[in-house]
Amino acid sequence: MSESNIPESVSYSDSHEWIQVESDIATIGITDFAQSELGNIVFVELPEIGEYAKRGETFGTVEAVKTVEDLIAPISGEVLEANETLEEDAKQINEDPYGAGWMIKIRIEDEEQIEELLSSSEYADIINE
């Protein structure tokens, strides 16, 4: 059973991204479970401002010591901001995945996609299977 931190204040995707909604802006990152499975994260590649993130498709990559994983957009929208501090200090993803380790902010295109995300308890069920 996992001892991951699963805040109730955010929603989740089954590909281990979290999403926090404020008005029409969504902040996205990877979950505590994902960062712990990856191990020490050494590099992250994020999209440029103005690019389009499409739900279910890759918006970037995260590189750990022994693996590289795609980052999958949990919803669609225009990228408004990318966390550039991660380029110099990717370990923030390991240290604070729901805070300083956030990855991108996008303008929400379709609010119905938010409804389809997982709650904290639904996400916990997935990672504890």
Residue ranges and their predicted role:
Residues H16, V62, L71, S76-V79:
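Conserved hydrophobic positions within beta-strands
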Residues S76, L80, E87-N94:
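Charged, amphipathic alpha-helical coiled-coil/dimerization segments
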Residues D32-A34, K66, I75:
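Short glycine-rich, polar/acidic loop-and-turn segments at beta strand-coil junctions
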Residues M1-T58, K91, E95-E129:
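Acidic, low-complexity mobile loops and tails
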Residues Q35-S36, I49, E78-V79, T85-L86:
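Short, charged/polar surface micro-motifs in flexible loops or helix N-caps
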Residues S11, E45, E63, E69-A73:
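Small beta-strand-rich domains/subdomains or short beta-sheet motifs embedded
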Residues A64, E84, I108:
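Short, conserved catalytic or interaction motifs in soluble domains
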Residues G56, V62-E63, A82:
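Residue-level recognition of conserved beta-strand edge/terminus positions
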